[in-house]
């Protein structure tokens, strides 16, 4: 979930024990549970990872990134779906999966995000939000 609070965006720093490539900065996200829609997953993961539940999802924004990683002897493909939401909450309660968070202005967020594809998602979200 790309989450805006005024002109800032929330980024989380993953702990090294919770994921491959730990220590990277990214948006709140996670795996879909059986029976969930994509948006239900995004909202659940946002709540679990940040404690933030009072959000307004911005209708019409849906972005995806795809990538592969090595899973032993095979390459594993993954697609991540992002939605855009706004909140007035700024207090974050981190899950065990994360070690830090930052509410950053957009320029600083581009510098902090670890992966280029996440930067593109942020660009797309900013452009979409500016045009609604």
PLM segments and residue spans:
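Active-site segment of metal-dependent pyrophosphate-handling enzymes
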Residues: 51-90
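N-terminal strand-loop-strand
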Residues: 1-27
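Glycine-aromatic-enriched surface loops/turns that form tight recognition elements
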Residues: 86-88, 120, 124
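The catalytic Nudix box helix
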Residues: 27-61
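Short aromatic/basic micro-patch
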Residues: 26, 77, 103
């Amino acid at each position: 979930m790309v989450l805006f609070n005024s002109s800032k965006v929330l980024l989380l720093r993953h702990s090294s024990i919770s994921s491959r490539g730990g220590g990277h900065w990214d948006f709140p996200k996670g795996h879909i549970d059986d029976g969930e829609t994509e948006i239900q997953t995004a909202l659940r993961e946002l709540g679990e990872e940040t404690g933030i539940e009072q959000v307004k999802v911005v209708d019409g924004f849906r972005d995806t990134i795809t990538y592969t990683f090595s899973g032993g002897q095979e390459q594993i493909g993954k697609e991540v779906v992002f939605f855009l939401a706004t909140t007035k909450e700024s207090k974050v309660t981190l899950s065990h999966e994360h070690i830090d968070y930052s509410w950053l202005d957009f320029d600083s967020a581009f510098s902090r995000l670890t992966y280029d594809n996440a930067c593109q998602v942020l660009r797309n979200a900013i452009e979409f939000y500016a045009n609604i």
